Amino acid sequence: MFVTLIKPLARLHPRAWDFVQLVRLDRPIGIYLLLWPTLWSLWIAADGVPELKNLLIFVLGVILMRAAGCVINDFADRNFDGHVARTKARPLATGKISVREAWITFAVLVALSFGLVLLTNATTVWLSFGAVAVASLYPFMKRYTYYPQVVLGAAYSWGILMAFTAERGELPASAWLLFLANVLWTVAYDSYYAMTDREDDLKIGIKSTAILFGDADRLIIGSLQGLTLLLLVLAGNRFELGLCFYLGLAVAAACFVWEAWSTRDRDPQACFRAFLHNHWAGLAIFLGTVADYALR
């Protein structure tokens, strides 16, 4: 549906689709995985009634910053992507978009995002600098550490902290439970993603948790998902959430079980489908959160 909506962009200019691919608007899974935990937190921070202004700011901010993250990622990987089957057709790797054009795109996206943050409050504005720093750092970590997914987890969890400061003007200690839960969840699902490229990454020297975990990959991913659910249960208790929230967690748990089963042979395509499937887990938790507040 999302891709159908943006396809008319390809008709605006002969190169328009190249930029759509650069910012991954044709692959919205990253938007969903960043959006759901941000919205969990916005709803919880606002006790179920987020300000419309903040809701619009964070939805648009998620889209813009995810796009910016894709640009900086492709810049960092431009000399590697051509050697990986899944990424060899990316616009920077093929030369359809120049490095200069990519940097201009990145700057525009970050500037637009910052303009949105300026509509919140000083605490949230200060936090936004950390968001840009962590998001920019992640792509380069794949050269130096087997834990780039942890950095990605921090980047994908930063919106949780900003949602609380935007709604409450402060950052309660309990918000860190949601932050840590989302970091662990991100490491889990991005490890599935990394499993699809593991053989290519080994050849070109790119590091990932999928390589680090080795034959214990599925066991460790399942453990991370279990810890994610445990932390969310603790967060639910601290924020006094009810039955609907926990039903959402139960659906997410079922999603995780399906992912473990479907990747039992470690087929790269099955691992990629398991990665995509996490969208439904995040959506289930969000719907459970919304329903819990709505039915009070």
Swiss-Prot record:
Q: Where are the transmembrane segments?
A: 29-49, 55-75, 102-122, 146-166, 169-189, 219-239, 241-261, 275-295
| Gene Ontology biological process terms from the UniProt entry | ubiquinone biosynthetic process
Q: Which domain of life is it from?
A: Bacteria
Q: In which pathway does it act?
A: Cofactor biosynthesis; ubiquinone biosynthesis
Task: Describe the reaction catalysed, as an equation.
Answer: all-trans-octaprenyl diphosphate + 4-hydroxybenzoate = 4-hydroxy-3-(all-trans-octaprenyl)benzoate + diphosphate
Q: Give the top-level enzyme category.
A: transferase
Q: Where in the cell is it found?
A: Cell inner membrane
**Any Gene Ontology CC annotation:** plasma membrane
Q: Which cofactor does it need?
A: Mg(2+)
Q: Look up the EC number in the record and give it.
A: 2.5.1.39
Q: Does the keyword Transcription regulation apply?
A: no
Keywords, alphabetical: Cell inner membrane, Cell membrane, Magnesium, Membrane, Transferase, Transmembrane, Transmembrane helix, Ubiquinone biosynthesis
Which Pfam family, giving just one, matches this sequence?
Answer: UbiA
Membrane disposition: Multi-pass membrane protein
* Gene Ontology MF terms: 4-hydroxybenzoate polyprenyltransferase activity
The answer on whether this UniProt entry bears the keyword DNA repair reads no
Q: Which family does it belong to?
A: Belongs to the UbiA prenyltransferase family.
Q: What does this protein do?
A: Catalyzes the prenylation of para-hydroxybenzoate (PHB) with an all-trans polyprenyl group. Mediates the second step in the final reaction sequence of ubiquinone-8 (UQ-8) biosynthesis, which is the condensation of the polyisoprenoid side chain with PHB, generating the first membrane-bound Q intermediate 3-octaprenyl-4-hydroxybenzoate.
Q: What is this protein called?
A: 4-hydroxybenzoate octaprenyltransferase
